[in-house]
Amino acid sequence: MSHPIEFFFDLVSPYSYLASEKIEELAQRNNRELIWKPFLLGGLFKALDAPPAPGLLPYKKPHLFKDLVRLAKFHGIPFNTPSEFPRLTVKPLRALLGLSKDELPEAVHRLYRAYWVEDRDISDSAVLEDLVGVETVEKTGSPEIKKALIEATDEAVNRGLFGAPSFLVGEELFFGHDRMDLLDAHLKGKL
């Protein structure tokens, strides 16, 4: 039995956005189930006692968006540098966890494009309601949904993740948008 691809991401991660635009085709090409796994990247960094948002380090930040613009152009993915980075993604991630498995992929794409293409504030309730619906946003304050995000982040920690995007196939971890070719080769039995 073939393991599914588990795609761990946070909406705040621009590299996860780029990966989200390619992962479905990669999974389909390899006849693998794709499981979307939203989690809180800041919570992961905190649990690992890692510096928050490595991309924001003063010596790295000037290069970050140049790199992203190049990558997006190279892969033909729409991308605009947002006016605010990072944005808080707790509420949007909770909204995603309140959706069904079937609703999740399209909602992820809507939220990513709103942030990384349209420069919309996905942490704003009105914007979020427009993207995923009032009912979904209302659920973000429920104890069950809050607990689900904590559990999703704990799972990322417990399974050895250290950043996003991360891909797990069984126990094989592939970290980063730039490792998707290696993930593809692994799924084809070449690695």
Language model features: what each stretch is:
Residues H3-E6, S16-R32, E106, R110-L191:
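C-terminal cap of thioredoxin/glutaredoxin-like
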Residues L11, Y15-Y115:
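Structural alpha/beta surface segment adjacent to cysteine/selenocysteine redox centers
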